[in-house]
């Protein structure tokens, strides 16, 4: 099992798929990395030799990935909340950011339903 950028890459998968296990590396970036390292996309991770792994590590090191990328994303969200813009307010209140309706859906962002007791109707 190869270890790249602090992530254990599954050895039984093809290189392109295996590299997507790294946070910040998708399909297209995985293809770029393999081209820079001159490794075949169809080659499985278990068939990589030490030189190829070293080349891949070097190619991946030019990108922001894993912890560095996670911290940048969280700092961006924190900045939005600090300046008090609309997206920051929505982040702070745990609601959808991109204009979705919230009357019926958005259970993922709002969490489990909170029941509200009905007022008893006044009798005539």
UniProtKB/Swiss-Prot annotation:
Protein name per Swiss-Prot or TrEMBL: Small ribosomal subunit protein uS13
Biased composition (Basic residues): 100-124
Xref: PANTHER family: 30S RIBOSOMAL PROTEIN S13/40S RIBOSOMAL PROTEIN S18, SMALL RIBOSOMAL SUBUNIT PROTEIN US13M
InterPro entries associated with the record: Rbsml_uS13_C, Ribosomal_uS13, Ribosomal_uS13-like_H2TH, Ribosomal_uS13_bac-type, Ribosomal_uS13_CS
Subunit structure: Part of the 30S ribosomal subunit. Forms a loose heterodimer with protein S19. Forms two bridges to the 50S subunit in the 70S ribosome.
NCBIfam families associated with the record: uS13_bact (TIGR03631)
Gene Ontology cellular component terms for the protein in this record: cytosol; small ribosomal subunit
Keywords of the record: Ribonucleoprotein, Ribosomal protein, RNA-binding, rRNA-binding, tRNA-binding
One function term, GO molecular function aspect: tRNA binding
Organism: Flavobacterium psychrophilum (strain ATCC 49511 / DSM 21280 / CIP 103535 / JIP02/86)
Gene Ontology terms describing biological process: translation
Location of the region described as Disordered in the Swiss-Prot/TrEMBL record: 94-124
PROSITE patterns on file: RIBOSOMAL_S13_1, RIBOSOMAL_S13_2
Protein family according to the UniProt entry: Belongs to the universal ribosomal protein uS13 family.
Segments passing through the bilayer: none
Function: Located at the top of the head of the 30S subunit, it contacts several helices of the 16S rRNA. In the 70S ribosome it contacts the 23S rRNA (bridge B1a) and protein L5 of the 50S subunit (bridge B1b), connecting the 2 subunits; these bridges are implicated in subunit movement. Contacts the tRNAs in the A and P-sites.
């Amino acid at each position: 099992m190869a270890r790249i950028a602090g992530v254990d890459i599954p050895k039984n998968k093809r290189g392109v798929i295996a590299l997507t296990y790294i946070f910040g590396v998708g399909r297209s970036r995985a293809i770029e990395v393999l081209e820079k390292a001159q490794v075949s996309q169809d080659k499985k991770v278990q068939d990589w030799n030490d030189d190829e792994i070293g080349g891949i590590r070097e190619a991946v090191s030019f990108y922001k990935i894993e912890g560095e990328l996670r911290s940048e994303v969280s700092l961006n969200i924190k900045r939005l909340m600090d300046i008090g813009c609309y997206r920051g307010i929505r982040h702070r209140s745990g609601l959808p950011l991109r204009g979705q309706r919230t009357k019926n859906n958005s259970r993922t962002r709002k969490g489990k339903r909170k029941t509200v007791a009905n007022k008893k109707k006044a009798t005539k």
